[in-house]
Swiss-Prot record:
GO terms for molecular function: box H/ACA snoRNA binding; mRNA 3'-UTR binding; RNA binding; telomerase RNA binding; U3 snoRNA binding. It is found in: Nucleus, Nucleolus; Nucleus, Cajal body. There is a cross-link at residue 5 (Glycyl lysine isopeptide (Lys-Gly) (interchain with G-Cter in SUMO)). It is linked to Dyskeratosis congenita, autosomal recessive, 2: A rare multisystem disorder caused by defective telomere maintenance. It is characterized by progressive bone marrow failure, and the clinical triad of reticulated skin hyperpigmentation, nail dystrophy, and mucosal leukoplakia. Common but variable features include premature graying, aplastic anemia, low platelets, osteoporosis, pulmonary fibrosis, and liver fibrosis among others. Early mortality is often associated with bone marrow failure, infections, fatal pulmonary complications, or malignancy. The gene is NHP2. Disulfide bonds: none annotated. Expressed in brain, colon, heart, kidney, ovary, pancreas, placenta, prostate, skeletal muscle, small intestine, spleen, testis and thymus. Also expressed at lower levels in the liver. This is H/ACA ribonucleoprotein complex subunit 2. Part of the H/ACA small nucleolar ribonucleoprotein (H/ACA snoRNP) complex, which contains NHP2/NOLA2, GAR1/NOLA1, NOP10/NOLA3, and DKC1/NOLA4, which is presumed to be the catalytic subunit. The complex contains a stable core formed by binding of one or two NOP10-DKC1 heterodimers to NHP2; GAR1 subsequently binds to this core via DKC1. The complex binds a box H/ACA small nucleolar RNA (snoRNA), which may target the specific site of modification within the RNA substrate. During assembly, the complex contains NAF1 instead of GAR1/NOLA1. GO terms for biological process: rRNA pseudouridine synthesis; snoRNA guided rRNA pseudouridine synthesis; snRNA pseudouridine synthesis; telomerase RNA localization to Cajal body; telomere maintenance via telomerase. The lineage of its organism: Eukaryota, Metazoa, Chordata, Craniata, Vertebrata. The modification Phosphoserine is found at residue 19. Its main location: nucleus. It comes from Homo sapiens (Human). There is a cross-link at residue 5 (Glycyl lysine isopeptide (Lys-Gly) (interchain with G-Cter in SUMO1)). One of its GO terms (cellular component) is telomerase holoenzyme complex.
Length: 153
């Protein structure tokens, strides 16, 4: 005689968990307090597409250490930060560096999605996208929208 355990969530919750996809609203729950300005759902998708194009041209900088090094060297681009990175101290100095150097930056909801867009199996908390003529139109569109976002106080 064996006991049959009832599934507390039901079959629809189990099917949702198997899909692996989380909605934008679910991702916003895990945001840290400094994640401002936060990209909209539409802008987030555009940024992911731009990042994928930049990866093909090898025009991205990935990770806190690499991004910080090239920002200090004067490299230009859009900085995309993951809003669910903890502890905050890992990358809280990067927005200040961007503001000092007039670089546009934006937060997106998920570090796992950011890493996946960059072609990595690992989560990535910060990526800098550099301009390139192959995807200049998509880059300019993202740059315009990121610059129009209000900066935090």
């Amino acid at each position: 005689m064996t006991k049959i355990k009832a599934d507390p969530d039901g079959p629809e919750a189990q099917a949702e968990a198997c899909s692996g996809e989380r909605t934008y609203q679910e991702l916003l729950v895990n945001q840290n307090p400094i994640a401002q300005p936060l990209a909209s759902r539409r802008l987030t998708r555009k940024l992911y597409k731009c990042i994928k194009k930049a990866v093909k041209q090898k025009q991205i900088r990935r990770g806190v250490k690499e991004v910080q090094k090239f920002v200090n060297k004067g490299e230009k681009g859009i900085m995309v930060l993951a809003g669910d990175t903890l502890p905050i101290e890992v990358y809280c100095h990067l927005p200040v560096m961007c503001e000092d150097r007039n670089l546009p930056y934006v937060y997106i909801p998920s570090k796992t999605d950011l890493g996946a867009a960059a072609g990595s199996k690992r989560p990535t908390c910060v990526i800098m996208v550099k301009p390139h003529e192959e995807y200049q139109e998509a880059y300019d569109e993202c740059l315009e929208e990121v610059q129009s976002l209000p900066l935090p106080l």
